[in-house]
Amino acid sequence: MSKTITKGSLTKEQVDFYNLEGFLVLEDFLNDDDLAGVRASMAARVNEIATDLLTAGLITNTFADSPFELRLAHLFEGLDDKAFLKYGRSWRDRLPGYFDLMANPKILDAIESLIGPEIFSNPVYNTRPKVPKVAAGAVPWHQDKSYWPDANANPVITVWVPLVDATLENGCLH
């Protein structure tokens, strides 16, 4: 099978799949260097949450020595739904690492393949930690396009970037 390249970084086959199915999975698309800034921003946010949880008496261990991939899950293990929703449902921090990820040329090139070169990002975005075995804060499949009246004439694409391997065991998009 030939790999016809479209304008942007995706192949014609990938674009056709997206247009037919409405989604596209690009495994190993971003490398550790691409994710370093957003992981650092996320780690700083997790440090703040650990301090808040400890100060509030909701945890006795900040799991400071836990690896990035596990620390947040460890912090949230014993929390009830109310505490989880306060600290883990939706982060709207404006941190440099998040912006760097949104402006990553690989991501923008892939999006260009799907909608063309006129790309803008809505300033309302969420960082939603997906923690294994936590149902609180789950968000069902939906389309954000309805939130923006002017969007009906334009394509809207959501880019989901897991910062750790997304598996059934450790939490994945479903």
What are these regions (language model features)?
Residues 1-20, 27-141:
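Non-heme Fe(II)-dependent double-stranded beta-helix
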